[in-house]
Amino acid sequence: TGGGKTMCMIEDVKRQFKSPVSKTIVVVAPRILLANQLCSEFLEQNLDGNYNVGVDVIHVHSGETHFYSTTKSDNIKKWYHNSTKHIIMFTTYHSLHKIQDTLDVEVDTIYFDESHNAVQKNFIEAVEYYSIYASRCYFFTATPKHSLTPFKVGMNDADIFGQVICNVPAPKLVKQGYILPPKVVINKIDLPDDDRFAYEHDRDCVLDTIDAQDVDKILICARSTKQIINLVTHSTFVVDLISRGYSWMMITSKTGAVIDGKKVDREEFFNTLNSWGKDSSKRFVVLHHSILSEGINVKGLEAAMFLRNMDYITISQTIGRVIRKGDESKTFGLLCVPVYD
């Protein structure tokens, strides 16, 4: 959400890497795209005081990266024992157990980013393991998930998640100028009729909103991958966007990343997304289902448009994509909500 959670981790890593004894840091993210983004943001900083010459990096997930990447416990163990430097491991909640399975990796500090994901039953075993056995363990989220029953894990379980060290309300971040206030706009649309395909109605809904709000950089949250594919392949949506001066990109776990009709790897997608976000003259639309909701930092993103229902955490995370500060002309994050007239 732009509150500075990542910088808290980075500054702590800098303090850890001042030690003459090699330290092992693990950074956990909910998605591969965010793990790669965190790696980029960490290594932009001078972590070890020697421009990261004394730092080894490994990714433990199935995604693409320039760094050594593996999900095999034996390979992790071999790489770990061959390193004589400070170590940072970037992984996902899905793959964290792969590090746990090595048994040899002694974790000095572990950071759980978007840690509301940690309470999921298929992740909690590995999370609890490192809560006990890592020397230092920290959880970061803008949307904590609590439980009122002892039969379901929540972040209010102090035995696993500890006590709250710092809690900064969003209004305080807005007041102090770290993030922008959100602005909700209701866009009334006609009820769909049986004479037209659903994707034609979706096209009109999106284009009417774009025309009405006149924003340059828009995130569209679709109901499903199928809705996105139908919109860009079966309707005139892409042609209509181009005629308005917009580029387009989409990313889902099923289709991968696409920029202006060309399939690209996730790293190129992420780099292009940030490059376009920084370019004040660039107009573009990003379509996704949920992959960009959590933690992804896109500079300059002005508006989010909802085409589906969401739980409060996903809504809050999506709002966080557009309330980050941009240039001086951006004074709020726009949230476009279509409703039937």
Where are the language model's segments positioned?
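Walker A/P-loop
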Residues: 1-12
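Conserved Walker A/P-loop ATP-binding site and its immediately adjacent core
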Residues: 8, 21-46, 223-226
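Conserved helix-turn-beta segment of the N-terminal RecA-like "Helicase ATP-binding" lobe
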Residues: 33-70
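Conserved helix/coil segment N-terminal to the catalytic DExD/H
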Residues: 69-109, 291
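Conserved RecA-like P-loop NTPase helicase motor core
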Residues: 117, 253-341
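Post-DEXD/H (motif II) to motif III coupling segment of the RecA-like Helicase ATP-binding lobe
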Residues: 117-179
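Conserved interdomain linker/interface between the two RecA-like ATPase lobes of SF2 helicase motors
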Residues: 162-229, 234
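Conserved helicase motor "Helicase C" RecA-like lobe of SF1/SF2 P-loop NTPases
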Residues: 225-252
